[in-house]
């Protein structure tokens, strides 16, 4: 049974190549274009890992990360923040809120897939 990866970003130009990359590596994918949509998708599909942008409409990625970590039913979900917000303060905040990893844009496909594999052991 393939592992599920939820890709959360408001830019289709980011989502499409990430979705292709994940599927080429054997992962089932889901997509959300906002933090609000991400929360709904997480509650329905319970992904194994979330690739999460920070700058999202309505509910930002930091808040999504925090909400996931506050729900004990979702303790097993791994979170990678994948964002252009690469300042040390943002990295520290993301990790403090419970993200498992923080990758800054622009990123390499090999960097992303290596981190995904590391976190969900596939």
Question: Model-predicted segments: where are they?
Answer:
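C-terminal output helix
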Residues: 107-116
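Hydrophobic residue at a beta-alpha junction
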Residues: 32-33, 58-59, 68, 85
């Amino acid at each position: 049974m393939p592992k599920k990866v939820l890709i959360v970003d408001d830019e289709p130009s980011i989502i499409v190549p990430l979705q292709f990359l994940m599927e080429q590596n054997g992962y089932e994918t889901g997509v959300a274009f906002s933090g609000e949509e991400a929360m709904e998708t997480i509650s329905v599909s319970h992904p194994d890992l979330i690739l999460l942008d920070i700058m999202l409409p309505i509910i930002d990625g930091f808040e999504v990360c925090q909400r996931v970590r506050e729900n004990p039913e979702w303790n097993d979900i791994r979170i990678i923040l994948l964002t252009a917000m690469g300042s040390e303060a943002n990295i520290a905040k993301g990790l403090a809120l419970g993200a498992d990893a923080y990758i800054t844009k622009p990123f390499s496909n090999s960097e992303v897939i290596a981190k995904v594999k590391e976190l969900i052991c596939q």
